A protein has these predicted regions:
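Short beta-strand-to-loop capping motifs
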Residues: 38, 164, 241-245
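Alpha/beta catalytic cores of group-transfer enzymes, especially the acyltransferase/condensing modules
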Residues: 105-149, 219
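ATP-binding N-lobe of GHMP and related small-molecule kinases
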Residues: 1-78, 268-272, 276-279
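Glycine-rich, charge-dense phosphate/pyrophosphate-binding loop(s)
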Residues: 193-279
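Phosphate-handling active-site elements
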Residues: 62-67, 94-110, 247, 251-256
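DPxDG-like acidic metal-binding loop motif
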Residues: 80-106, 133-135
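Short glycine/serine- and small hydrophobic-enriched flexible loop segments
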Residues: 54, 58, 89-97, 190, ...
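Acyltransferase
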Residues: 153-214, 220
């Protein structure tokens, strides 16, 4: 049996689909690599890994269970799409190692089902899966699991601020409050369709942040340092800032307040999609 590696990216929320059926996200340079090797009785790993493989084995009885090794640059539980990248990589690797021939759309819908089954998503996060699979900006109908539009990422340098001691797990969120404000999210779809993903992302983050809470001190700091767009990434709690001048980003990192528990990661948007290679 061949060994393979699957590599894909995290992302930033543009429209969170908790409140209504449409979702959108944009891929960023933070990457996850998952290596699949040989056949094992039990691969070990996290409960999410167990649940994902259990879901896939129920779907495809008699399939080979591969050994799995995960390396990731994507902070977990921060709204940066680490769970979607993880689930997508597992589904793509599992189907590849078992020689299954399924279409891109079938793969993405299977990953959305797996995301619900493993408890990392409430809606299936079809938008996040699409941006990780294709790169760039993806707008989706998460109810019908259809890709409505995909286009290249906006320009700009991205700075992420997050506190590793504070995180939010999507599967444990109460989204009933968000759904009460579904009409507030309705205009965001048109913004994305018309090529304004960062404007939509800014509004989306602030709408959700009003309910979940957000770090206004960090947001205000990045604004002072010249960021063009600053918001919480979806449910957060990570904050992202987009700069158009490198010296502004460098200053934001250099003078970031100490003793806050926050870490900063410099990255960028990416149009690179998922890659599968033999190892």
């Amino acid at each position: 049996m061949r060994d393979i590696e699957v590599r894909c990216h995290g992302g930033i929320s543009i429209i969170s689909a908790f409140a209504q059926r449409f979702g959108a996200s944009v891929s960023i340079g933070l990457e996850m690599g998952v290596r699949f090797s040989g056949a094992v009785q039990f691969p070990g790993g996290s409960i999410e890994t167990e649940k994902t493989l259990g879901f896939l084995l129920k779907k495809y009885p008699g399939s080979t269970i591969p050994g799995i090794t995960i390396e990731s640059d994507i902070p977990q539980g921060q709204g940066l799409k680490s769970s979607s990248a993880f689930t997508l990589a597992l589904v793509v690797g599992f189907t590849a190692i078992n020689g299954m021939n399924i279409s891109e759309l079938e793969t993405l819908r299977l990953a959305a089902e797996a995301s619900i089954a493993n408890g990392t998503s409430i809606t299936g996060a079809f938008d996040d899966l699409c941006s990780s699979y294709y790169g760039g900006v993806c707008l989706t109908d998460n109810a019908s699991m259809d890709l409505l539009k995909r286009y290249d990422s906006p320009t700009g340098l991205v700075l992420i601020a997050y506190n590793p001691e504070k995180y939010r797990i999507t599967g444990s969120m109460d989204i009933s409050t968000l759904r009460k404000y579904s009409e507030s999210f309705t205009p965001l779809k048109d913004l994305v369709m018309n090529g304004y993903p960062l404007a939509a992302s800014l509004i989306n983050g602030h709408l959700i942040g009003e309910i979940t809470g957000m770090n206004t001190d960090v947001i205000g700091y990045f604004r002072e340092k010249g960021a063009s767009y600053v918001s919480q990434s979806g449910k957060g709690p990570a904050v992202f800032a987009v700069f158009h001048r490198k010296r502004d980003l460098d200053d934001a990192v250099r003078y970031f307040p100490t003793g806050t528990g926050f870490r900063c990661i410099s990255t960028g948007f990416t149009n690179e999609g998922i890659r599968v290679s033999d190892k």
